[in-house]
Amino acid sequence: MPLNLLQDWCRGEHLNTQRSMLILGIPEDCSEDEFEETLHEALKHLGRYRIIGRMFRREENAQAFLVELARDFDYALVPREIEGKGGPWEVVVKPPHSDDEFLNRLNHFLEEERRTVSDMNRVLGTHSNHSPTKTTISADFWVWAQTLGAVMQPLLEQMLYRELRVFSGNTISIPGLLAFDSWLEHTTEMLQMWQVPEVEKRRRLMECLRGPALQVVNVLRANNAAITVKECLEALRQVFGSVDNRKIAQLKFCKAYQEPGEKVSSFVVRLETLLQKALEKNAISRKNVNQTRLKRILGGAILSAKLREKLKMLKQRRRPPGFLALVKLFREEEEEWEATRGSERSCYEGLELGPSPSNIGSEERELFVPAFGSVLEERPYQGSRRRRHRRRGQHRKGGVPRDDSQGTRKQNYDTFCYSCGEDGHIRVHCFNPSNRTLVKQKRQAAMEKGNRSWAWEKSHPKPKTK
């Protein structure tokens, strides 16, 4: 059948059947120049094209050419025959699968018969005001209905059939081919929709496979001719799917962190997927799932100090909330924060914003301390442990600690905005006008102040007691 030949040839050449056509009946004595000239005159309105190859068909005693067009073409503009040497050349194209094409053909048929859609409903007995038992169908209408059914049947079959997306399994990405996970999801969904026998499903699955993926299924069919589509997909998943063993699933969960710009609630949802995969692989115990989830959230999420203390208290009391309770808690916190910032944002509409944080210089990044209380938690200074040990040593040796001006005063952070220069917020949350002069003054003051009390200890070390 010419249409099957077109599909098989396009499959072997990795071509799109909707952009290809098969030309049959070219005599052997037709020269290449004569063929190209005739083809150019017949297809010039369809745009650019190229000749893929030729073959000899014994049943017709003539040649067949495969032609690929550069873009999609209108099915109605394709000639059914081309007048050439030795008689008309047959043009074979694959009919489109669009609803618009079906409606166009149906409307054209109704126009030729001088009928309307209401006439069709009346004949078929689908009109609300006409019952099939009360309608008298004449012989002419019966013939017309049979003709309409014969025309609609192949079009309906074409509309219901959708080709699966192509998958090859090659490591090198090829344009038009999908990654395995996306392809598997689409193929599984389409196979469940098709109400066709298992043999037909397997044939359609084979049509969309190329390269190594096709070789895998061919080997399976050689060993088991009655293999099902589900078994084929499972084998392809084992060969080309992602490797998620017990150790990898555990590492993915334990190394999950909140991404920049990601909300805490979104991170918890993403973490839950990793947790369920780890549970399926028995990488994590099912006994204390809520405790494990809460521990990972405390270690991988950016939380406010108040919320972190609340979650730590629940963890210590062995009363961790479940997944839905955590999502609800974080979403309420985020909505409250958005409502607060929304009211402030409305007050500063129309004001000029400072440059983005990505444009901060290297010197500014050193002083850029994210300490906005409602979003980021305040982290203790790394040198506090060192000073605590030093004070303990002084008390053991009988040393007297310095006065409040040199070391025992309360630790305080001088965090200010690098856009407006005001205290209490950071640049990414600033809606004030830019004030570079104030920022420069505060930077200079912070650099002169240094590291406070421990900077004095470095520059004025105490003599060692013998």
From Swiss-Prot:
What are the entry keywords? Metal-binding, Nucleus, Zinc, Zinc-finger
Q: A single GO molecular function, which one?
A: zinc ion binding
InterPro entries given in the database record: PNMA, PNMA_C, PNMA_N, Znf_CCHC
Expression across tissues is: Expressed in the cerebrum and cerebellum.
- Name by which UniProt lists this protein: Paraneoplastic antigen Ma3 homolog
What segment(s) does the record annotate as region Disordered? 379-408, 441-466
GO CC annotations, alphabetized: nucleolus
Compartment list: Nucleus, Nucleolus
Q: Where is the composition biased (Basic residues)?
A: 384-399
Alphabetical list of PANTHER family matching this protein: PARANEOPLASTIC ANTIGEN, PARANEOPLASTIC ANTIGEN MA3
Q: Where are the zinc fingers (CCHC-type)?
A: 415-432
Q: Family assignment? A: Belongs to the PNMA family.
Q: Where is the composition biased (Basic and acidic residues)?
A: 445-460
